[in-house]
């Protein structure tokens, strides 16, 4: 008879030094009993408390625009700060091409609150609200889920004092300022007809304001401002509503009135319910370390989940160029051309969402490329000499055209264009493969065959273009030239990005076509060409401008950016590591591991740029110390805002650094990018963790780590697909039991890889096959709300 599950659940707070100590997803030493969160066949986590550990605490008012707090419902976003009592900027992601703001709201009568000596505030990420209190007043701001309306609920106001709120735009904007007695609106439309690649479509912005109070009156105070005045209710409460829907023109007052009337019927609970349901879905983390650095990173990862949900649920991505555009507090200013998307700055967000178990937050990313497929096909045919398939522009307008329009260049730059002069992304031809591989990863994680069928044309057309662009040498080799090694090396032979793209994409297309039972001819051609792809280029650090012989693995040899290593470098990228991530060709073992490690250690740009993938690539390679040091270094360098968001170039809030951080934490805890589940492949021993990470086939790994030891290891099966697990305790006998019945489903084995054939909806414990010591006490993973700002070196989350 098998031992009970509880018999195996043990925890060690020190290193295990004897094989007689056991674990079943949990390690045990009878002398140092601990706790496990596993009971009755599942992992128990008190989600509300864990999420609220990451609330952002303000002990002083956030008076400056750069101190603004982010809010949003995935379509309408806000930046909220305390300038002149209360200021909020509304932002949408569909006011193309310049992503113009619908306006700012100012409530000067809230100065009594923000000027109070007892002022305090909390960005409540569990509720999706910004809560302020002071001087006997409270103000709670949020964006409704059902409608694109921001709501400010105030209590403690003096009913005798006239309240006011203004909705304002600025020069050179030219809105129509409209009032109808109890509400005011600013409406503006424009044509997308000036930039290169213009769509000719009409876009616009509409914002409308009203209040739930007494003696309400609206007036136009200037061509750019409407104002409402009112008294609070007798109990001192009032509510201000500001609606901002998608706007392409029409009867602005009628549309505004309809929206605001509907919004007046919404309750706070409706909005909170959505957020509470949202927080039931992601895999959460509770991290701790003696220096509290782990807690700080946990906070940033939770903020990443929060901002992703707040900005990523519209028809197209809310973020471009790595910026949190929906959280802007600087009017209509943009560092980067706001009509375009940079794929390089989206990819970490896609990956982080997958590992968090939130694939639905990638819907707008895939829609950007799927819906623009006809335009990308046309672009490729026009600018790539009539070739078939798609060359996806690395920098692509929202309408699928490969123009980068910047105020600081005299002529729009072309992407994926054989007819362009050499430039950063003029001939970056690997982006289509990257998008395709994220389609494939999303399918592997979700098993959604309908999704795969809808997006498969991206894979097919990307592969067809690469076949058409590449040429064969007399020996049969398949090569690309002229081609960019992303933005760093222009018009070179066989960039590492191209080689990696084809090595990764071709097998994915073959498998996808087989699943969907289509394109057998293409699959056969790709299978044939796989044998003709070049190996990765190599150089020796002693002579970095000269290629070494193929497959040279001598000391000092690293992966080069292309087969033209002496080519001029134009950007600070580590392209020799692209085969590690995102392409997943090299991991923490295998014949290329050693050279990849050397490439990482000798990378030219260490912890450079807020989008740096250093910590993710370190985790993929199993470099624990490098994962930790790079994650901390990038955070201390770029996370400068009290909201937890980053600064990079310009004055906008960047979300990409938190995306890298979230992805890196997940990757260091659990990896499953190639069908092999790796447990804690790069997790620091001085960081404790209680975490859930998504894996392929709708699965989840629940993991508790203490001082480097695995305390609990449970797997939730989301499908009947087989799961391959690398032995978490190399060389030791491991078994897997059904978590509810305790019936062994995998007999004890000391093999390097353990296979599990799960039952949908069942959970399993992975454990050592020998158990000793006392059963561990059950204790759910719990947390308490943050009550102070957090700090990491010179950086802070919150305001002291």
Question: Locations of the language-model features?
Answer:
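Surface-exposed beta-strand/loop patches in extracellular or lumenal glycoproteins
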Residues: 161-172, 714-730
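Acidic/polar, glycine-enriched structural segments that form the non-catalytic walls/loops
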Residues: 32-66, 71-339, 359-363, 369-381, ...
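Active-site core of glycosidic bond-cleaving carbohydrate-active enzymes
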Residues: 342-378, 385-393, 398, 414-417, ...
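Short, well-ordered beta-strand segments enriched in hydrophobic/aromatic residues
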Residues: 150-156, 502, 701-703, 710-717
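Solvent-exposed beta-hairpin/edge-strand motifs
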Residues: 725-741
């Amino acid at each position: 008879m098998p031992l009970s599950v509880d018999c195996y659940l043990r925890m060690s707070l020190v290193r295990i030094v004897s094989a007689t100590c056991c674990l079943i997803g949990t390690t045990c030493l009878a002398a140092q009993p601990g706790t496990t969160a596993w009971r009755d066949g599942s992992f128990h986590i008190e989600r509300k408390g864990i999420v609220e550990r990451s609330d952002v605490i303000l002990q002083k008012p956030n008076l400056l625009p750069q101190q603004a707090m982010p809010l949003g419902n995935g379509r309408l976003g806000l930046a909220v700060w305390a300038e002149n009592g209360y200021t909020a900027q509304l932002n949408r992601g569909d006011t193309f091409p310049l992503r113009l703001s619908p306006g700012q709201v100012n409530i000067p009568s809230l100065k009594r609150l923000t000027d109070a000596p007892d002022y305090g505030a909390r960005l409540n990420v569990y509720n999706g609200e910004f809560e302020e209190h002071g001087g006997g007043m409270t103000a709670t701001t949020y964006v409704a889920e059902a409608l694109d309306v921001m709501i400010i609920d105030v209590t403690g106001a003096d009913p005798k004092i006239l309240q006011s709120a203004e909705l304002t735009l600025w020069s050179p904007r030219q809105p129509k300022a409209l009032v109808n007695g109890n509400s005011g609106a600013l409406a503006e439309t424009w044509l997308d007809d000036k930039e290169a690649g213009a769509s000719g479509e009409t876009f616009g912005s509409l914002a409308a304001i009203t209040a739930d109070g007494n003696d309400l009156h609206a007036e136009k105070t200037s061509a750019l401002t409407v104002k409402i005045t009112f008294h609070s209710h007798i109990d001192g409460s009032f509510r201000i509503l500001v609606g901002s829907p998608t706007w392409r023109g029409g009867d602005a007052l009628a549309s505004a009135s309809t929206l605001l009337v509907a919004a007046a019927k919404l309750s706070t609970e409706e909005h909170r319910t959505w957020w509470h349901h949202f927080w039931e879905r992601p895999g959460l983390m509770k991290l701790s370390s003696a220096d509290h650095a782990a807690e700080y990173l946990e906070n940033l990862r939770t903020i990443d989940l929060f901002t992703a949900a707040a900005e990523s649920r519209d028809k197209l991505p809310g973020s471009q160029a790595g910026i949190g555009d929906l959280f802007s507090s600087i009017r209509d200013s943009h560092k980067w051309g706001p009509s375009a998307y940079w794929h390089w700055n989206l990819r970490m967000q896609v990956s982080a969402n997958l590992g968090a178990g939130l694939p639905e937050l990638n819907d707008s990313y895939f829609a950007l490329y799927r819906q623009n497929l006809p335009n990308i096909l046309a672009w490729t045919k026009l600018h790539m000499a009539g070739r078939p398939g798609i060359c996806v522009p690395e920098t692509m307008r929202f309408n699928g055209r490969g123009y980068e329009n910047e105020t600081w260049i005299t002529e729009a730059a072309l992407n994926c264009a054989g007819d362009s002069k050499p430039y950063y992304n003029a001939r970056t031809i690997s982006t289509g493969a990257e998008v395709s591989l994220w389609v494939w990863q999303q399918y592997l994680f979700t098993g959604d065959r309908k999704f795969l069928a809808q997006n498969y044309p991206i894979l097919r057309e990307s592969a067809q273009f690469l076949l058409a662009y590449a040429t064969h040498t007399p020996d049969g080799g398949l090569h690309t030239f002229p081609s960019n090694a992303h933005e760093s090396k222009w018009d070179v032979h066989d960039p590492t990005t191209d080689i990696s793209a084809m090595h990764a994409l071709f097998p994915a297309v073959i498998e996808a076509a087989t699943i969907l039972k289509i394109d057998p001819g293409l699959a056969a051609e790709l299978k044939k060409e796989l044998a003709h792809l070049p190996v990765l280029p190599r150089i020796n650090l002693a002579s970095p401008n000269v290629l070494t012989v193929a497959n040279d693995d001598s000391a000092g040899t690293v992966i080069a950016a292309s087969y033209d290593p002496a080519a001029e470098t134009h950007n600070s990228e580590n392209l020799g590591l692209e085969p590690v991530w995102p392409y997943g060709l090299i991991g923490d073992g295998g014949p290329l591991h050693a050279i990849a490690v050397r490439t990482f250690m000798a990378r030219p740009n260490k912890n450079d740029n807020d989008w740096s993938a250093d910590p993710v690539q370190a985790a993929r390679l199993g470099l624990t110390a490098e994962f930790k040091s790079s994650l901390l270094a990038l955070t201390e360098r770029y996370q400068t805002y009290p909201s937890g968001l980053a600064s990079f170039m310009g004055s906008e809030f960047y979300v990409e650094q938190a995306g890298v951080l979230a992805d890196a934490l997940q990757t260091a805890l659990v990896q499953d990018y190639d069908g092999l589940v790796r447990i804690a492949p790069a997790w620091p021993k001085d960081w404790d963790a209680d975490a859930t990470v998504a894996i392929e086939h709708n699965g989840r790994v629940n993991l508790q780590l203490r001082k480097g030891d695995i305390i609990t290891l449970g797997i939730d099966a989301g499908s009947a697909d087989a799961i391959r697990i690398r032995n978490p305790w190399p060389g030791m006998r491991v078994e897997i039991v059904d978590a509810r019945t305790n019936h062994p489903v995998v007999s004890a084995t000391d093999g390097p890889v353990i296979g599990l054939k799960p039952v949908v909806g069942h959970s399993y414990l992975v454990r050592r096959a020998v158990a000793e010591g006392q059963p561990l006490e059950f204790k759910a993973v719990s947390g308490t709300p943050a009550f102070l700002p957090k700090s990491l070196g010179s950086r802070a989350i919150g305001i002291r």
